[in-house]
Amino acid sequence: MEKKSLLILGTASHVGKSSVVTAICRILSRNYRVAPFKAQNMSLNSWITKDGKEIGIAQAIQAKAAGTEPTADMNPVLLKPKGDCVSQVILLGEPYADKSAGQYYDSIEEMNGVLEGALERLWKEHDIIVMEGAGGAAEINLYERDVVNVGTARLTQAPIILVGDIERGGVFASLYGTVALLPEDVKKNVKGFIINKFRGDPEILKPGLKQLEEITGIPVLGVLPHFKLRIPSEDSVSLGDKEGAKNEKEVEIAVIRLPRISNFTDFEPLEGLVKVHYVDIDEDLGNPDAIMIPGTKNTINDLLDLRASGMDKKIQAFKGKIPIFGICGGYQMLGRTIFDSGVENGVEAEFEGLRLLDIGTKFGEYKKRTIQVTKKVNGYGPILKSIDGEDIKGYEIHMGVTDSNRTVFGDDGAIDEEGLVIGTYLHGLFDNENIRNALVRYLCEKKGLEYRPEEIISENDAYEELANRFEQNIDMEKLYEIAGI
């Protein structure tokens, strides 16, 4: 069977490659067995597969849009920045090593073998693979070490569609310049352009589109309008693009934007209900209705940065007044102490936490817990009492072990005596409708506001909405021709 594939590259980061791949996966899945693939992803937002492997959340979303189970082969290399130019390398879903950029590039040959194996396994089970590049495709300083753009193009010889973002300006120069800078053996496979995030009447673009096609000999497949995606974001670049909720003047949740923040997608489900405001650690915290401390790639360093900035005292001042949630690394920070045997920060030491929960955490070995879980709510306190005994789902991605005398979700997490400080290892907590609504209902009632339940759109409907918008604006006949299907 012919190994069919399609490669989506971009002119820069955050131009919409992931959403384009998601849309194409959804559309093609109606008639074909489709798998997404991203050779190398650098992201702190990750997902745990059913067999406990860790991959980038974008590939999990794309797989679900394609109607297939996410697997580690769809994102064989995941880089999770830890700071100081060092990243944790996740190889086929398992922690491999902490490497500097130079050390990682020295192991590129080894990575290429991993990628080839992953692709072969995917092709055995699927009719077509829709692949995604990373950042800008024309990073000429990286061509000899690149595995995700030029490297994937050379490995698969896939037809390429190049995506540009018009919202930030300069899209024609970006598309033309990217093609001009690509190596000749890759350039020949660029078969189409997509312009993304356009606001206004697309008629005014026609002269530019025509000229771009004449200069490059490459057709423009369509112009996608700017619209609000209802699927999770991939990286922290998009934190600056968050739109307010319809009730943003009524209820506000402050998320502490830790220097090494990870899995900020945990809070996206709240954005349709309240204003979710990301606060840098050196900013004024203001007067929020709830505080969230997210996950982090380095709990201890972010805890030390919180303390150095004075944000620790600002958070502590709200104890007993408003809900304070900590997820994963944020949960660990809420406790009395964190003991590190050297696996987290390089040296053996004990650090004082925020002391908002009666827990202690120990980093004893370089071992990560990655698992999908279902837990029952222990309905202690004013927020959770209405959903006592109900099930919630989530996933864990963490190092360290935490002791807790008063758990909050089954055997997980902790809650203080007043029921307002809640810590948990569960990512995806607010994906659960019962948790989400219990919190927002409490916040509304506390302010004397009428609680208005959210307008719920299912995950499946969100994928269909994206796919339909794509089909309405893209020359699908030409796209099928390019893909060879």
Curated annotation (Swiss-Prot):
Keyword Transmembrane recorded: no
Pathway assigned to this chain's UniProt record: Cofactor biosynthesis; adenosylcobalamin biosynthesis
Pfam families reported for this sequence: CbiA, GATase_3
Key words of the record: Cobalamin biosynthesis, Glutamine amidotransferase
BP GO annotations: cobalamin biosynthetic process
Family matches, as SUPFAM superfamilies: Class I glutamine amidotransferase-like, P-loop containing nucleoside triphosphate hydrolases
HAMAP family, A to Z: CobQ
Similarity comment: Belongs to the CobB/CobQ family. CobQ subfamily.
Protein name as it appears in the record: Probable cobyric acid synthase
Taxonomic lineage from the root: Archaea, Methanobacteriati, Methanobacteriota, Stenosarchaea group, Methanomicrobia
Protein encoded by which gene: cobQ
